[in-house]
């Protein structure tokens, strides 16, 4: 069942009913100011950090869902009132449409012949949202309405805002000047920032105190001021500051009225905080408001935003026979990669924006799907991540985006973390050819007195694994590896503690991870190549010895007969083995080890992937492990705390499905690779949205597995490494156009029935227009490549860096 449709020409998903299976959201903002907005205008905005600089308030896990946002109430002459976004009033509308575009959302609602259309977006180089409201009278009689705007301010620190009521009920402060409401809570003391909400029209009243506007016992659906048709002109003093403009408007027959609201954020230099004692300096806010006085100003900024996305998405465009594949690669997958890079895992409708910041493992993987768009941002992120490493090569698990300082709020000691830095750095160098990044001086633990080159950071990442091997010579798992919930040293009996942050019960010198072994080989090969290209042959040989040894160790101690083991627990017992009662086979080592090339030559790789298909496959994707754990295993940790079929306990953890798709291309099975890719890709799931529930235009982290009552239901959409890895899988391994240190490799591995495809790729200062033909209907293999009319040797397209377009013909066979 569908609840909308793709508008590929305008690069929008169009939702035609407010009653979707779950709120379907979008993200606004490209730099420092970001917003989450649902198809009903719910959500919130923040500056840089969703925890420390939350601007508007939102209530998670609320009834009804999606409570709090940017609301407009239209009150008609007969007392009927409604919201064009349907929420929060939920009055029936004769027309509803929400268009989620790239960095903007347009919502239209109509009732009684009056249509209201609101375009929400964050302009480029702007710290605020624009709300462009157009009221159209579609009748032949004049319409007199009372319009109320509404947003509720958060008192900056989102955690404190929802917990420290004894203080917060007494701190709220505002200023009102003309048609602008300023939120200045705590500005009198340590803060130098404020927010504001403005409208480009004279107002007939206002409210800034929530209780005065709402009434103590009313909800968003029926504020007392709207019910009665009169604002209170309230000035907040403590309690809950809001911003509500009241306008009395007349719209002529078949005429329209246009209004521009700005929800903005301003920081003032300490010496310029005040206009005069007690009155904030509004200079910057007035400049922001002045920028959007007319509809033409709005359209110009929206056009600039769309052109920005034109340029970014134009760096990779594909043309295949499959329109769903085209729209995912050309539009939505790249868009999601940008969002995950900007937001990491911090703020969504499943992440509160409070506990999680920029994850080390997460963000290094996000770079893989983002680096082609804005490589300079990827470069800075790599350096920021390296700066939270410790001198032994280990690292904090995350940093707070506002401070860029590492913290252990969601735990530490995840022994896979350091290796991801090698993969992101190598991806950056392959994309850009910029080897100078390795010479950048980066501190350890943000300590300027402890600096080393980025290359030295990579070296310590590599040797952290070498120096932390267990009894079998496999890497020690620490608190966990990529699977945060496989806690082999935790042994938690206390329900009041977190698996991720509690002190491990054991010293961690026994439990080993086969997954990290595969990751070490994959990243280690890159480290060896980097050393060689830097002329460090001795370093390269030494590192290569460790990589070869790990391959041998994995084949000897990490192979279970039909698939790769998952781990050894704290007692040296196998995890993910046919010997286990439950949890006999796990997906992660099968994908990672084969991606790393382990077992390809001796047939183990094919056996492992065949076992994945036999034991882990479902109509909705590959489950993480089987059989699901039916009880709590204290020696395994959080993974066994979930009911069967959910999350890590045999849910379809979409993030690792692309690893298996890539692994299938390693052994040349294009049909199977594309089948795995397609099963979790949202555009292919649009027709079953009532089952899938989350947005049909972005990937979700998790889909309920076959052991779950709600098999096929997705959760945790948007902020997931699935986005980056799916983009890597389809563009670099299935379509097979991937950056190398020397140029663009063309090595497709596609379904045999494909006739071919086209891909345009901007790479290192040139544009490659690549046409792949598959007349013999093979899955893998390149017979010849012709560049600009000349046949080349091998499969790597040269680096031109000449600003020109180069035409490439690839013949498979």
From Swiss-Prot:
Keywords: Carbohydrate metabolism, Cellulose degradation, Glycosyltransferase, Polysaccharide degradation, Transferase. SMART domains: CBM_X. The active site is at residue 484. Optimum temperature is 85 degrees Celsius. It is an enzyme of class 2 (transferase). It catalyses: D-cellobiose + phosphate = alpha-D-glucose 1-phosphate + D-glucose. GO terms for molecular function: carbohydrate binding; cellobiose phosphorylase activity. Optimum pH is 4.5 to 6.0. The keyword Electron transport does not apply. PANTHER family: CELLOBIONIC ACID PHOSPHORYLASE, CELLOBIONIC ACID PHOSPHORYLASE-RELATED. This is Cellobiose phosphorylase. It comes from Thermotoga neapolitana (strain ATCC 49049 / DSM 4359 / NBRC 107923 / NS-E).
């Amino acid at each position: 069942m569908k609840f909308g449709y793709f508008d590929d020409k305008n690069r929008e998903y169009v939702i035609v009913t407010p009653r979707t299976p779950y709120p379907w959201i979008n993200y606004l903002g490209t730099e420092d100011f970001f917003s989450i907005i649902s198809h009903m205008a719910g959500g919130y905005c923040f500056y840089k950090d969703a925890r420390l600089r939350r601007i508007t308030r939102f209530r998670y896990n609320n009834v009804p869902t999606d409570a709090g946002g940017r609301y407009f109430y239209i009150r008609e002459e007969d007392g009927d009132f409604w919201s064009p976004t349907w929420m929060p009033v939920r009055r029936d509308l004769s027309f509803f449409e929400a268009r989620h575009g790239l960095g903007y959302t347009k919502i239209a609602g109509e009732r009684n012949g009056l249509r209201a259309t609101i375009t929400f977006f964050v302009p480029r180089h702007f710290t605020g949202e624009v709300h462009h409201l157009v009221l159209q009278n579609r009748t032949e009689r004049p319409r007199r309405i009372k319009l109320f705007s509404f947003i509720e301010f958060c008192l900056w620190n989102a955690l404190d805002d929802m917990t420290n009521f004894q203080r917060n009920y007494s701190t709220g402060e505002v200023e009102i000047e003309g048609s602008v409401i300023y939120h200045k809570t705590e500005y009198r003391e340590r803060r130098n920032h404020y927010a504001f909400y403005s409208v480009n029209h004279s107002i007939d009243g206002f409210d800034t105190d929530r209780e005065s506007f709402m009434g103590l016992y009313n909800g968003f659906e029926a504020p007392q001021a709207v019910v009665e048709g009169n604002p209170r002109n309230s000035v907040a003093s403590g309690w809950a500051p809001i911003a509500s403009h009241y306008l009395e408007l007349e719209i002529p027959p078949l005429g329209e009225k246009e209004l521009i609201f700005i929800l903005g954020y301003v920081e003032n230099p300490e010496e310029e905080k005040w206009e005069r004692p007690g009155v904030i300096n509004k200079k910057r806010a007035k400049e922001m408001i002045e920028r959007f006085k007319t509809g033409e100003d709005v359209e110009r900024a929206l056009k600039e935003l769309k052109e920005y996305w034109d340029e970014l998405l134009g760096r990779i465009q594909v043309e295949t026979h499959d329109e769903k594949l085209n729209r995912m690669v050309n539009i939505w997958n790249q868009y999601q990669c940008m969002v995950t890079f900007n937001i990491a895992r911090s703020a969504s409708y499943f992440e509160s924006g409070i506990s999680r910041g920029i994850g080390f493992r997460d963000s290094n993987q996000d770079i893989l799907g983002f680096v082609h768009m804005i490589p300079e941002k990827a470069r800075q992120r790599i350096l920021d991540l390296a700066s939270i490493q410790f001198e032994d090569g280990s690292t904090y698990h995350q940093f707070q985006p506002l401070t860029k300082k590492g913290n252990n709020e969601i735990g530490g000691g995840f022994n896979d973390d350091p290796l991801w830095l090698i993969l992101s750095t190598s991806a950056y160098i392959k994309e850009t050819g910029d080897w100078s990044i390795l010479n950048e001086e980066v501190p350890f633990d943000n300590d300027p007195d402890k600096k080393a080159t980025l290359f030295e950071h990579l070296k310590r990442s590599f040797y952290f694994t070498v120096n932390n091997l267990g009894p079998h010579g496999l890497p020690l798992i620490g608190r966990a590896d990529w699977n945060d919930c496989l806690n082999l040293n935790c042994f938690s009996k206390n329900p009041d503690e977190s698996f991720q942050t509690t002190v491990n019960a054991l010293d961690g010198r026994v439990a080993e991870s086969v997954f990290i072994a595969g990751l070490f080989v994959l990243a280690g090969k890159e480290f060896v190549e980097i050393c060689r290209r830097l002329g460090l042959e001795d370093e390269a040989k030494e590192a290569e010895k460790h990589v070869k040894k790990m391959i041998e160790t994995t084949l000897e101690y990490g192979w279970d007969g039909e698939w790769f083991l998952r781990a050894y627990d704290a007692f040296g017992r196998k995890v993910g083995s046919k010997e286990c009662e439950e949890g006999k086979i796990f997906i992660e080592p099968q994908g990672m080890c084969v991606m790393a090339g382990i077992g390809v030559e001796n047939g183990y790789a094919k056996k492992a992937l065949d076992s994945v298909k036999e034991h882990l496959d479902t109509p909705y994707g590959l489950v993480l492990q089987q059989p699901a754990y039916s009880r709590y295993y204290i020696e395994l940790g959080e993974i066994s705390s979930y009911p069967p079929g959910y999350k890590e306990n045999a849910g379809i953890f979409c993030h690792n499905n692309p690893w298996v798709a890539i692994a299938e291309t390693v052994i040349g099975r294009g049909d199977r690779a594309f089948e795995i890719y397609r099963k979790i890709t949202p555009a292919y799931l649009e027709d079953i949205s009532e089952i899938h529930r989350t947005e049909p235009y972005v990937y979700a982290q998790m889909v309920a597995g076959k052991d779950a009552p709600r098999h096929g239901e997705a959760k945790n959409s948007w902020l997931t490494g699935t986005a980056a890895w799916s983009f890597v899988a389809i563009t670099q391994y299935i379509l097979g156009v991937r950056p190398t240190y020397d140029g663009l490799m063309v090595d497709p591995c596609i379904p045999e029935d494909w006739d071919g495809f086209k891909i345009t790729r901007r790479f290192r200062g040139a544009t490659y227009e690549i046409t792949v033909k598959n007349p013999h209907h093979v899955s893998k293999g390149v017979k010849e490549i012709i560049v600009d009319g000349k046949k080349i040797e091998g499969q790597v397209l040269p680096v031109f860096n000449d600003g020109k377009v180069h035409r490439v013909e690839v013949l498979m066979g």
